[in-house]
Amino acid sequence: MNVQAHMSGQVSNQGTMSQQNGNSQMQNLVGGGSAPATGAGLGPSRVSPVDNDILKLRQAMRIRIFNILQQKQPSPADEASKAKYMDVARRLEEGLFKIANTKEDYVNPSTLEPRLASLIKGRQLNNYNQRHANSSSVGTMIPTPGLQHSGGNPNLMITSSGDATMAGSNNITTSAMNTGNLLNSGGMLGGNLSNGYQHSSSNFGLGSGGNMSSMSSQRNTGQMMPTPGFVNSSTNNNSNNGQSYLSVEASNNSGGFSTAPMMVPQTQQQQLRQDIGGQNSRMLQNHGSQMGVGLRPGMQQKLSNVSNSSINGGVGMNAKSVDSGTSYTNPIRNSQQAYDNLQRSGMQGDGYGTNNSDPFGSGNLYGAVTSVGMMTNTQNANTASFQAVSRTSSSLSHQQQQFQQQPNRFQQQPNQFHQQQQQFLHQQQLKQQSQQQQRFISHDAFGQNNVASDMVTHVKHEPGMENPSESIHSQTPEQFQLSQFQNQYQNNAEDRHAGSQILPVTSQSDMCTSVPQNSQQIQQMLHPHSMASDSVNGFSNLSVGVKTESGMRGHWQSQSQEHTQMSNSMSNERHIQEDFRQRMSGTDEAQPNNMSGGSIIGQNRVSTTSESLNPQNPTATTCRNGNGNRDPRFKNQQKWLLFLRHARHCKAPEGKCPDRNCVTVQKLWKHMDSCAAPQCSYPRCLPTKTLINHHRSCKEPNCPVCIPVKAYLQQQANARSLARLKNETDAARSVNGGGISSDAVQTSAGAKSCTSPGADISGHLQPSLKRLKVEQSSQPVDVETESCKSSVVSVTEAQSSQYAERKDHKHSDVRAPSKYFEVKAEVSDFSVQTRPGFKDTKIGIAENIPKQRPVSQPDKQDLSDVSPMQETTKVEKEPESLKKENLAESTEHTSKSGKPEIKGVSLTELFTPEQVREHIRGLRQWVGQSKAKAEKNQAMEHSMSENSCQLCAVEKLTFEPPPIYCTPCGARIKRNAMYYTVGAGDTRHYFCIPCYNESRGDTILAEGTPMPKARLEKKKNDEETEEWWVQCDKCEAWQHQICALFNGRRNDGGQAEYTCPYCFIAEVEQSKRKPLPQSAVLGAKDLPRTILSDHIEQRLFKRLKQERTERARAQGKSYDEIPTAESLVIRVVSSVDKKLEVKPRFLEIFREDSYPTEFAYKSKVVLLFQKIEGVEVCLFGMYVQEFGSECAFPNQRRVYLSYLDSVKYFRPEVRSYNGEALRTFVYHEILIGYLEYCKLRGFTSCYIWACPPLKGEDYILYCHPEIQKTPKSDKLREWYLAMLRKASKEGIVAETINLYDHFFMQTGECRAKVTAARLPYFDGDYWPGAAEDLIYQMSQEEDGRKGNKKGMLKKTITKRALKASGQTDLSGNASKDLLLMHRLGETIHPMKEDFIMVHLQPSCTHCCILMVSGNRWVCSQCKHFQICDKCYEAEQRREDRERHPVNFKDKHALYPVEIMDIPADTRDKDEILESEFFDTRQAFLSLCQGNHYQYDTLRRAKHSSMMVLYHLHNPTAPAFVTTCNACHLDIETGQGWRCEVCPDYDVCNACFSRDGGVNHPHKLTNHPSLADQNAQNKEARQLRVLQLRKMLDLLVHASQCRSAHCQYPNCRKVKGLFRHGINCKVRASGGCVLCKKMWYLLQLHARACKESECHVPRCRDLKEHLRRLQQQSDSRRRAAVMEMMRQRAAEVAGGSG
């Protein structure tokens, strides 16, 4: 029987009829062609009452949509417009009907408009007008049941005629024995096709003639209906392995291949109708494509395996592209599981195509991606027989399996098939209602428009084939519209003669529903003011195949001339083709079988058409049942994400990347890095940022964009895991024989081979990933393997147990760190295992990014002669014939793996084997975690899976999310709470929900600037980042970077060789290597020493020795038996001069008293390191402020202990001789040593605010361990006081008092005035901020704005009380001062003990000034009475009753004590130590938060400390240090050449390689690169610091210089940058490189600038911004203190009650 297929998807002519031969076939075609119009073959109407109700509901929905359209218009519509709106409404309703999951979803009015917007934005809406009835002869044949099918001719020849009218005879001559020989009976192609095109010996009824439809096909059986109970077995043996047999059993002989489903008798077809629909539009899953795939013997394929796929664009089984480089042979173990998965997916409406990559025994192996005769996607084929040429091209649907191609949208001439189209649409509606009422969704293949992209498939010209364009009728010319959303990549197969190789088949039906009408039209209709046009030359992807011959190109060109409306698109295509041809260096496009030529049929190209790459509306979808990832728009977004990765860190010199658009995307990155504009007009900025933000936070398990991207990254990351299997020794030998064994590598579903790896999409500060490890998604990902821009070929995780049991074969989730990190998707060689008895083939993989791999491995072959856009494999027979990768220029400093030998990429390289083992043991102790968590993690050691880290034995570990604070109120946004955000980088603002709701109107204030609420993005604070992974280059095992002590910053672009600890131990013990010397990686001891650090260290070591002696004596042991703290290092890592500006309101009160406007001080950071398990761990840190003798009163000679922090990892954990913890003893000694140092330098007092951090927050070290509890304020205060008591015993501290008693009270004989002007004014202290708030409240009370009478009454009472207390001057500022002190005292009094004043020198009892010179007059009787010289003179002038002691008759004698040994000058003799990361506490905390340098466990503390030391030894190299004299661009480290004679002549690598520096008379030498240096060296660090200082000096000079011919080096260059900054329209926020670098320098300058009237541009603005950040931090700290005090008061009240 001949089953004719129609566009409607129905099965027509079901009745029994004979298949006619020859031209009589036209009778069937004509008859079939009338079916859509007349309903013939459909039977009576099956529209039930339910259908009528649905029709009424749909009509009501159309009217509702029509009304919405009318309401969106600014003016009333005329009749013509109304008709247009109704037509649009009809099309929109059809789209809504198709995407609705349930009836409730369909009618839901609350989501109607969003769904409409999604349809409009997510689809080209003109595809419904492009469906046409097709009465082609593409009928699937049901073979006669019960007869065995055999064949003996391995070389199948078929007719390749597109129609009988073209060749006169279209018969398939069948012998009486039905041997399956397909004889060429003529045809328009003039001969048999290439030997490689394999056709099944399909059984035709005896005497039926076996009419075969038009084109050659890999499998006819893919469309045949399976007949249960009948097995088509083969009678041939191995000699026939070129012949394809139809058998569903896995037990057929080695010459046969299980390729076809079983046949279904006619009696069952009606039962299948609902599931199958049109047989020509749906195909059964041809699962058992290779021999021995492992299907259950005799198992019938379930009906749910029906593929619901449109036959569009020549992709019969699959509307997607088919990868040409991966074998899809199923492993035995998991084949049934995969089979069942396919069944489940099919039941969900997720069609799968045939998987029939059939190996020939000795011929060419063509997967379903081989090219075939007709240009199905580019020509009109057989219009005599194809009465309507639709998206379905002229080939058979199963032939579409042979193409690797993308869906095609053919735009017909407007009125050509109007009648058939309308009939089809009506028929389509009837079918949808009758077939799928239960699901309320249409699964009909032709009811789906799964094309949103106009792909042009160019097919390779085969020998003996005519150019099909010569035989194409012109009645229905197809127009190729390259729309702005066209960005599909396309892959065609590359035919090969040599060696039997497998090219893959993957197919999957596309369930997405397009919406008719042009999207821009409707968008303009709905949102007439929101349409923004973009450049026609926007970035887009265009599928470009290899041109076959010039005649073919001429045909395309003639077509473009014939269709004038498409001239622009075709012009673009020709331009792209020409460009692509130029890229194809060394490839032979005209040769069909060019194994060695490197010809590529499916190429990936990013062209400059329109803005089709714009990933707009990344989350909008019009797809059903999770099949949205087959939507071409989602594929666009996937490819855009991956191309963004490539461009981020493309290693090619600028302009040298094989993809010319790489530069464009790099500019886009640079723009987005600082772009904060909500409606940025920069091309592709907004949609790209939207896509990136979605990808960053995507948690959807079925996300059609992110899941395939992650799957691709998984494929790349795990490719090396498949490289070294146990047959690696046979890897160089080629495959010899027919089949692929059942344990061959199967590419996992969802492996998208897309653009080359590059940078992660997010951020800047993150360390680079050596390799990215991605967890295999739990749901089936898109089965297609797409060829994308600059893609590489690799194989995803194998499903066989053989691979799954390998512990070095892992995957895990990728959580791209939020800032700066690089991604290296490692691509390796992989081994395709053949069936037993055959040798392995080692297939090399082309690494496609220039300069990605420095040197090729000697035993591995890199396909550098292949275009970077090619995705294919080659059988490597002669390694010496293949070129090395064009990556690195030098082979020096490389390892055996071909990677640069960068020393110290992991700190374990410095360890001895025993230290490595100790480190691993320490990892599994989980020090820092609670007991329960530690035990849980330790238990995982006994159940390590393949995904577990080989060091810590745990699979998935996530970082603590950094805290987020509300900009207006400063409150911390809680975990999992919603918030709003806007901006980027330092200018990002956050708004908590209460602040957002309290802000009325359309704007909200952020730091005084109104922000439109429309710009705010609502988010949830639930982001998680997984720990990074790294893979050993030796054993391929995966470890956490933190466990491996891997320094991503030293990874040299992802290419540094990494050896895991286990391999390292083995190599050391086998004497293959030695541990690096300790000096190879600079540590804490290598940091600069200062007088302060030496003083504290010497004191600490001395006291530890004394403590150890005391402990030995107390315990009755010898000195050596007592454990003590060892390997301690103290360093000052930052020592810079700063200025503290007095807050304006406070300054206003004391302006008449000549109060200083600013205070100069020196900020210092002191850190303590201890070597624990071989790693120097930062355990303790403190920030101090030193106000010297040159500082104005009241801060003169004062020290403020600003912040102090520690983590509880100190070793050993023992008690000291006095009972306190040894760690406490050490920390106390550090503080006492610092106070002693301050006293020796002449400082008189130290101020300490004993304020513990708020729960969940940190002062210096980010993320404390769970085992370390945050102390209460009283505990912390006692900790400080215990330290001060020790210092008092040693005579270092003279007196300890609190701030309130010293400055707010006049006790005893104190004669000092109570005024706020006496209070020491410190940066970040409690009272200056609190005073500013109080002054503001007082000013509001005076103005009557707040409290009115109540406020005035309170002020009056306060003044009266002050007057009664003896205060007489209550006017003006004096009154404000007294009121301020009164209210401030009320605020401070409850917590006065927390504000500790430490006097290092005696203070005068009368004036309270600390005495540093002259004499102090001491009372002979009173112990604590002493006054200064000035007060003594005043004392002598007083009357006797007012002299000391007051109110006593007997007066005491005073005698002088000379004050000695106090330096007059407190100036620091240490050098300035600058560190941008330690400049402020917040800067260091931000560094740690942004890079996840956490201290919550010892393992993380070790890694974090290692990275902190790296940053300290490698300060950021300043910009403009080295500039190319030719192109005037900056030269990165190791990327340039320097003249040995001229002091300032440098050229970059690009300019040097272009002209070789021939224009310069002297010799040029290459700059040293990171790989050429040892791990680090001090001289380089000092040089960088010196260069940075010079650059900052230059910045200050240039801002003041007025000379046009200044001789100051580079002065004119900086002035030019100033001028550029004034005129630049892009700015730093827009991505301007010069502006960004200038901005960086300005920020460095502003942090260090002490000039209040600085002339450097933007200096004041930057300082104001920093001030606001500090103010927010201080406000949070004060708020935390007040909350603590309220809780304390509540506790006291509750206790007393």
Swiss-Prot record:
Binding positions (Zn(2+) 2): 1419, 1422, 1444, 1452
EC number in record: 2.3.1.48
One of the Pfam families matching this protein, by short name: ZZ
Catalytic activity: L-lysyl-[protein] + acetyl-CoA = N(6)-acetyl-L-lysyl-[protein] + CoA + H(+)
Protein name: Histone acetyltransferase HAC1
Tree of life domain: Eukaryota
Biased composition range(s): Basic and acidic residues: 873-901
Claim: Kinase is one of the keywords in the record: no
PANTHER family found in the cross-reference section: CBP/P300-RELATED, HISTONE ACETYLTRANSFERASE
Lineage: Eukaryota, Viridiplantae, Streptophyta, Embryophyta, Tracheophyta
Biased composition (Polar residues): 1-16, 385-398, 556-571, 584-628
CDD domains xref list: PHD_HAC_like, ZZ_CBP
ZnF PHD-type span: 989-1066
Organism: Arabidopsis thaliana (Mouse-ear cress)
Record: residues binding Zn(2+) 4: 1539, 1542, 1560, 1562
GO biological process, one term: regulation of DNA-templated transcription
Binding annotation for Zn(2+) 1: 1404, 1407, 1428, 1431
Main location: nucleus
Record's function text: Acetyltransferase enzyme. Acetylates histones, giving a specific tag for transcriptional activation.
Protein localization: Nucleus
Tissue spec: Rosette leaves, stems and flowers.
Binding-site list for acetyl-CoA: 1204-1206, 1223-1224, 1279
Binding, Zn(2+) 3: 1524, 1527, 1548, 1551
GO MF annotation terms: histone acetyltransferase activity; zinc ion binding
Gene from which this protein is expressed: HAC1
UniProt entry keywords in alphabetical sequence: Activator, Acyltransferase, Chromatin regulator, Metal-binding, Nucleus, Repeat, Transcription, Transcription regulation, Transferase, Zinc, Zinc-finger
Positions of region (Disordered): 1-45, 202-221, 385-439, 555-574, 583-631, 843-901
